[in-house]
Amino acid sequence: MIKNQYINSDESVFNDAKALFNLNKNILLKGPTGSGKTKLAETLSAAVNTPMHQVNCSVDLDAESLLGFKTIKTNEQGQQEIVFIDGPVIKAMREGHILYIDEINMAKPETLPILNGVLDYRRQLTNPFTGEVIKAAPGFNVIAAINEGYVGTLPMNEALKNRFVVIQVDYIDGDILKDVIKQQSQLQDDAIIEQIIKFNEDLRTMSKQGQISEEAASIRALIDLSDLITVMPIERAIKRTIIDKLEDEREQQAIKNAIELNF
């Protein structure tokens, strides 16, 4: 068993992702923040025994962040020379590894067309910094993740989206969520786990209604909360892992109200 693997009662999510990987299809994981998209990519990487190189997208992402950069290095003869340091895209291509592009719709649209040749049948790239044409080694594949409707995201270009096959990754719940908490956190007390799962369900409802951000109701936040509960009171653990991350006082108060109802 893969340690801290992605778990979902809908086995088709992982099985389809693995099938798409074996078909050398680009995979786009779409779902709310903290639903386990990165964990799914990591589990797939381990299952197919292929290392993964990650790009974390933001509005500041540029070609150097993707491809690499030039720098000055002293060679064995003591002379300085200009060398190119491969970035995550080129590393993954050369080694036949997985390229994971997280929050791809956080990047500026004008940054991503440089990957068009990487994402289509050519699987190749002309490095604009060196002129080298890089052809991906066998085994290379691309997985991207998208948080639709999240603050700071941009609509994904249709031409780019059409280069992927989409898998929806929703939040998990019930017994599966209980198993994930036990597997990925220090908390093992069933009664407390059921309490915080109910609390998390309330947060998800509030998130869907626009009262709080998605991140506050994420699986990631729940795992952090589960760990902290083993060393401090529940209310303080919630404050540290969820409330103190929020800037909006109305969101903070909404969660405090949920605490009073659940604990």
Curated annotation (Swiss-Prot):
UniProt keyword annotation of Cell cycle present: no
Membership in a protein family: Belongs to the CbbQ/NirQ/NorQ/GpvN family.
InterPro entries: AAA+_ATPase, ATPase_dyneun-rel_AAA, CbbQ/NirQ/NorQ/GpvN, CbbQ_C, ClpA/B, P-loop_NTPase
Presence of the UniProt keyword DNA damage in the record: no
GO molecular function: ATP binding; ATP hydrolysis activity
Domain of life of the native organism: Bacteria
Protein name: Uncharacterized protein SH1500
Residues the entry annotates as binding ATP: G31, P32, T33, G34, S35, G36, K37, T38
Source organism per UniProt: Staphylococcus haemolyticus (strain JCSC1435)
Matches recorded under CDD domains: AAA
Keywords noted in UniProt: ATP-binding, Nucleotide-binding
